[in-house]
């Protein structure tokens, strides 16, 4: 993928307690990101993964798993509904050939956007306070699994109230 990331910085125990008691930052740019759009994108995604996309409203994110034609799990990750017929999938494994093969017969466009989207995950009980000090107080009204557009220092970004720690957290997505 072209990324090199450390397993930990300094002391993993210290990192754990920082995330549980204050906040920690993770570079999530290496996650594989796909854009799926088109008139039949909802039906297409319903065929590939376990959640009903009709229930996922624009501006929301859901956690799900992708399955092959036999129902075996291929990978898990998140689906962002950016607009009515516009989605982003974030996952660990590359699967563009499978996504393209699965798109045959659907009026959809599937493309990888991993290199075009960078991400940082800010997790922990003081994550909001940190972002509020940066001028992002409007995050206070976000519910878990919301995603919204913001601008900070003339830099447009999407911020989702998501994360993998089980605590308060945000993922910040920008075009580098």
What does each model-identified segment do?
Residues 1-176:
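Glycine/proline-enriched, intrinsically flexible loops and inter-domain linkers
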């Amino acid at each position: 993928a072209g990324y090199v990331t450390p397993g930990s910085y300094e002391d993993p125990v210290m990192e754990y307690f920082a995330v549980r008691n204050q906040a920690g930052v993770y570079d999530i740019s290496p996650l594989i990101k796909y854009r799926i759009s088109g008139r039949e994108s909802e039906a297409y995604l319903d065929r590939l993964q376990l959640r009903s996309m009709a229930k996922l409203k624009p501006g929301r994110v859901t956690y799900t798993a992708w399955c092959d034609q036999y129902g075996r799990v291929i990978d898990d990750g998140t689906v962002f509904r950016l607009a009515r017929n516009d989605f982003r999938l974030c996952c660990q494994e590359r699967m563009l050939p499978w996504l393209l093969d699965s798109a045959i017969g659907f009026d959809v466009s599937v493309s990888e956007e991993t290199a075009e989207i960078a991400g940082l995950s800010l997790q922990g009980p003081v994550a909001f306070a940190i972002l509020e000090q940066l001028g992002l107080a409007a995050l206070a009204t976000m519910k878990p699994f919301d995603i919204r557009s913001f601008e900070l220092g003339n830099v447009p970004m999407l911020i989702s109230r998501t994360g993998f720690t089980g605590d308060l957290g945000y993922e910040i997505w920008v075009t580098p």
